[in-house]
């Protein structure tokens, strides 16, 4: 072998030796033992109280009956403008992406004629035996997909309690015979 080949092989072996030495040294310096259980533990404070389901417990902070006692249907009409891209509210109004909401309070859920409801909404309605009472409207309008899993409604919800109460008061007014307001001292109905 000539000296140029010996120099090349020596340089290659020297480089491999240096890299291996650095690797072994850094493994010794920066060694991290394997965890007993893979993953990270995230410690977070529990939010809101009580029942599983969170959204229902949070919405129950102030019962809708108490909020409706001071709700303003005129303010609710302004909130309803968010809904008009998908819903109508006049008597005999057409269905859009969502059903017409005239006389919706106390109407059986998923029962409006001429509208094709999602499977999630039909399941939730239990064959139209569940009604849009004030509590169901309150929980649904807070977070539609959380209250009715599988609903096709793409609206994120109305987070502020007072805005929801105003909107429900306005929806109540969309009727020839508005449903009576609930007793503000009554306990909220349990959600299924």
Curated annotation (Swiss-Prot):
It comes from the Bacteria. Keywords: Cell membrane, Electron transport, Heme, Iron, Membrane, Metal-binding, Signal-anchor, Transmembrane, Transmembrane helix, Transport. Residues 26-192 are periplasmic. Its main location: membrane. It is found in: Cell membrane. The chain crosses the membrane at residues 8-25. PROSITE patterns: CYTC. It is a single-pass type II membrane protein. GO terms for cellular component: plasma membrane. Heme c binds at residues 83, 86-87, 153. Residues 1-7 are cytoplasmic. Binds 1 heme c group covalently per subunit. InterPro entries: Cyt_c-like_dom (IPR009056), Cyt_c-like_dom_sf (IPR036909), Cyt_c_1A/1B (IPR002327). GO terms for molecular function: electron transfer activity; heme binding; metal ion binding. Belongs to the cytochrome c family. May be involved in electron transfer from bc1 complex to aa3. This is Cytochrome c homolog.
